[in-house]
Curated annotation (Swiss-Prot):
Residues 141-150 have a biased composition (Polar residues). It is found in: Secreted. Keywords: Secreted, Signal. Residues 151-253 have a biased composition (Low complexity). Component of the acid-insoluble and acid-soluble organic matrix of the aragonitic skeleton (at protein level). It comes from Acropora millepora (Staghorn coral). It comes from the Eukaryota. This is Threonine-rich protein. One of its GO terms (cellular component) is extracellular region. Residues 141-260 are annotated as: Disordered. Residues 1-20 form the signal peptide.
Length: 288
């Protein structure tokens, strides 16, 4: 029992000593802060003899900050600095340049980062310091405007030439009708029966009123052939076609009633009775 109590007391003593001793991480952080402060003090000592000229601006990006940049005269002992703070709320990086009396590199110790972090949304904050005039000024490189050469593609309107071809080709299609009109008079040489058809061709010129093309009037030469109809006295012979009544002799096939003999169907009918529609045959039903 005594051994157990002694072990417990020893354990408690070790816990107290461990908790009271400073952690190694804290020791390293304090050493780093001290090193940073000594470096900044050295920078301030080197620059206190002159007033630096620094760039001053603020923007959501480095380019926006550089576009609104202006030169300012710093107070004695101040250096040129650049702060880059990431705003977690808006998802943007705020870039600030100007003159600051820097006391530390952490956002909590730096007055510039502290001023930006009034809302508490700054996730990270980095700062850069230098001790020469305009050492924190930004630069812009704008080479992209050379892409304006693409506007030379305005030559495309030259494609308006094809429509002129379509308009000139259409009138050429009016020439074939003149050939058709010249062929009709050649048909007057056959029998006078064909001459009766020629007057019917005079109806075709009436269709020439629809086309607006001026070439259609060239068909007016065909009416000059109307002098040939003076031979229309011959059409009195057109009565001869009445001889076409001769085909009325076609009833000769009526001699087919010869097969008056009954026609027997050797197959069994599907029904009890039937009707055969042919006038030349009789349907005889067989039972059994």
């Amino acid at each position: 029992m005594k051994a157990f109590l002694l072990s417990l007391a020893t354990l408690l003593a070790c816990i107290v000593l461990t908790e009271s001793a400073p952690h190694s991480a804290d020791v390293r952080e304090e050493a780093f802060d001290a090193l940073v402060r000594s470096y900044l003090q050295a920078v301030q000592r080197d620059s206190h003899m002159e007033n630096l000229t620094c760039a001053e601006c603020q923007g959501v990006t480095e380019r926006n900050c550089t576009l609104g940049e202006r030169q300012v005269q710093c107070n004695p002992g101040e250096v040129c600095t650049t702060l880059e703070a990431f705003n977690l709320d808006t998802g943007t990086t705020t870039v600030t340049r100007g003159c600051f009396n820097i006391t530390g590199l952490n956002c909590g110790d730096n007055p510039g980062c502290g001023a930006l972090n009034t809302t508490g949304n700054i996730q990270s904050c980095d700062q850069f310091c230098c001790n020469t005039s305009l050492c924190n000024a930004g630069t812009l490189t704008t080479v992209t405007p050379q892409t304006t050469d693409g506007n030379t593609t305005t030559e495309a309107p030259t494609s308006t030439e094809p429509p002129t071809n379509a308009s000139t080709e259409a009138p050429t299609s009016t020439e074939p009708p003149t050939n058709a009109s010249t062929e009709a008079p050649t048909s007057t040489e056959p029998p006078t029966n064909a001459s009766t058809e020629a007057p019917t061709t005079t109806e075709a010129p009436t269709t020439t009123e629809a086309p607006t093309t001026t070439e259609a009037p060239t068909t007016t030469e065909t009416p000059t052939t109307t002098e040939t109809p003076t031979t229309t006295a011959a059409p009195t012979t057109t009565e001869t076609p009445t001889t076409t009544a001769a085909p009325t002799t076609t009833p000769a096939p009526t001699t087919t009633p010869a097969p008056t003999t009954p026609f027997f169907c050797n197959a069994t009918l599907a029904g009890l009775s039937g009707t055969f529609t042919s006038p030349n045959f009789q349907l005889i039903t067989q039972t059994g």
